[in-house]
């Protein structure tokens, strides 16, 4: 069986942090790994901004619930699944993706997890594994 691995944001769905930046008007949240290649530095920047602006995970999730897959993404995935095992490898978070995964007919997704406090504030994140995309494809 052949396997096809895809990224998620910017490929099948809009960039989540950019959508949140547009909704909140905070341009600094538009930064992606193209702008800040060091993922830990980028996430530190994002989490600092979210904390400074008193946003909770639920605030981000509300914006995500309004998003839809990019045009053609659902049919593209459905067609791929007829011939291949499809795995999505993403630097996003399970806590972000549920509404979009439903719209994409629940593809297999490997991504990271957010850490939240009892009040719902995002306090950190846990990588699925170091260098996750490269290691997944390598195996």
PLM features per residue range, with description:
Residues 2-118:
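Alpha-helical substrate-recognition element adjacent to the catalytic core
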Residues 128-139:
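Conserved Lys-Pro-Asp/Glu-containing loop-to-beta segment of HAD-superfamily phosphomonoesterases
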Residues 117-125:
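Short, charged, surface-exposed secondary-structure boundary motifs
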């Amino acid at each position: 069986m052949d396997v096809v691995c895809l990224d998620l944001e910017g490929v099948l769905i809009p960039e989540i942090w950019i959508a949140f930046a547009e909704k909140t008007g905070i341009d600094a949240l538009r930064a992606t790994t193209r702008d800040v290649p060091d993922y830990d530095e980028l996430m530190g920047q994002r989490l600092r901004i979210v904390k400074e602006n008193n946003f909770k995970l639920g605030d981000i999730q509300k914006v995500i619930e309004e998003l839809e897959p990019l045009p053609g993404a659902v049919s593209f995935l459905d067609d791929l699944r007829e011939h291949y095992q499809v795995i999505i490898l993403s630097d996003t978070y399970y806590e972000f993706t549920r509404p979009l995964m439903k719209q994409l007919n629940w593809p297999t997704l490997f991504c990271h997890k957010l850490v939240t406090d009892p009040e719902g504030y995002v306090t950190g994140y846990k990588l699925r594994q170091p260098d996750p995309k490269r290691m997944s494809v390598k195996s």
